Amino acid sequence: MANLSTLITIALLLCATMLTCSARPEPAYFASFTTSPADTLSLEMIESKLHEVAGESCDKEDDEDCLVRRTLTAHLDYIYTHKNNHH
């Protein structure tokens, strides 16, 4: 009887393990950490857009879109310059 309960316990643990493994499939696409020419081009386009937006001034106090763009520009500029300084 003890062998039967041990066998059932092991079978239940095995089934539970199989269910958790199948519940979280691996993603089909793994992002590469290498920089491809397309990524470099994309970064250059983003950087040129950042410089374009950075030169813009928010004249109106209620121009929320302008403030959002400038904040985003500042954050992205910090991220890219921080990344470039720590290679």
From Swiss-Prot:
Keyword annotations of the record: Developmental protein, Differentiation, Growth factor, Secreted, Signal, Sulfation
Residues excised as propeptide: 24-77, 83-87
Secreted is among the record's keywords: yes
One Gene Ontology CC term in the entry: extracellular matrix
Signal peptide boundaries: 1-23
Cellular compartment(s): Secreted
PTM info: Sulfation is important for activity and for the binding to a putative membrane receptor.
InterPro entries in the record: Phytosulfokine
GO aspect biological process, one term: cell population proliferation
Modified residues (Sulfotyrosine): Y78, Y80
Described purpose of this protein according to its UniProt entry: Promotes plant cell differentiation, organogenesis and somatic embryogenesis as well as cell proliferation.
Record protein name field: Putative phytosulfokines 4
Gene designation: PSK4
